[in-house]
């Protein structure tokens, strides 16, 4: 199992410094979200041009605000800047964001993703797109000098989205999904669908908060506050319920080095191919202890 790290909320200079340190520490990958801050692909274009080894990934870019051709052009540009080290993770986001903030319809999200992929997949493969659907059309090709085909992952939690990910992409990327749910739901559903579609082995990239600490109880209280929104968003709530977790703090990997190591190993045993650590800390000793454990696992 490969080990990556996740970062959000930094300036561009801080992101470059973080990526440089992650590469020096031996991490396999660096993942950046597209939320309400830096443009993830623009930021990774800069990182990819400056940091020579790390795989760079988005976890994830919402589909609705951008036409597939615009997203593909950004991804191919980041690919060109990084020598082909970009993996594009995309997702539906959430109804409260898409309708309440962006003003788009969230009707039939699986249909939306299926049509989006019909346009996006060929463009990421450096092939022309020729698709007309109910919600979007794409009849064009892109030419980005130096770009290589970009692997694609879909943030898939429910069965229909997992089946779609298996049929059309390289796999899935998950957040706030625990090892029991991965082992009993996510990985088997994805694998079965890939076997039926003949698409081969699937990649399962899974992220969770991680902290090595002597104050497990105190840091779990802190995690409950920091990550509380994920306990209310329906798609993540469904995964927490499958896991038997009362909230995000229950799936976070928090505690002694031995306990956190065992938690990461459970993710591997569940079928995760890439574990992404969201390094969660409140002080320097926790940050140092967490990073040291992760380095031991690389």
Identify the meaning behind each predicted range.
Residues 1-298:
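Active-site-adjacent structural elements that line small-molecule/cofactor binding pockets in enzymes
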């Amino acid at each position: 199992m490969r080990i990556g790290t996740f970062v959000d909320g930094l300036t561009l200079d801080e992101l470059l410094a973080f990526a440089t340190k992650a590469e020096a520490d031996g991490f396999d990958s660096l993942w950046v979200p597209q939320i309400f801050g830096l443009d993830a692909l623009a930021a990774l274009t800069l990182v990819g041009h400056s940091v020579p080894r790390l795989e760079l990934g988005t976890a994830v870019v919402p589909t609705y605000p951008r036409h597939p051709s615009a997203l593909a052009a950004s991804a191919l540009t980041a690919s060109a800047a990084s020598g082909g080290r970009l993996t594009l993770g995309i997702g539906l986001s959430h109804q409260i964001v898409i309708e309440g903030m962006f003003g788009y319809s969230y009707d039939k999200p699986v249909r939306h993703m299926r049509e989006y992929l019909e346009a996006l997949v060929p463009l990421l493969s450096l092939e022309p797109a020729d698709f007309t659907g109910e919600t979007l059309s794409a009849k064009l090709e892109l030419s980005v000098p130096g770009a290589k085909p970009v692997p694609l992952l879909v943030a898939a939690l429910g069965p229909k989205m997992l089946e779609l990910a298996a049929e059309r992409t390289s796999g899935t990327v998950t957040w706030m999904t625990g090892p029991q749910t991965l082992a009993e739901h996510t990985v088997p559903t994805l694998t079965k669908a890939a076997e039926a579609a003949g698409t081969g082995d699937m990649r399962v990239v899974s992220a969770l908060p991680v902290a090595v600490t002597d104050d497990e109880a105190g840091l779990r209280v802190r995690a409950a506050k920091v990550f509380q929104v994920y306990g209310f968003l329906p798609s993540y709530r469904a995964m927490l319920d499958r896991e038997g977790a009362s909230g995000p703090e229950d799936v976070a990997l928090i505690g002694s080095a031995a306990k956190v190591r065992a938690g990461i190993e459970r993710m591997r045993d569940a079928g995760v191919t890439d574990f992404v650590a969201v390094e969660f800390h409140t002080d320097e000793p926790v940050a140092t202890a967490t990073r040291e454990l992760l380095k031991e696992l690389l």
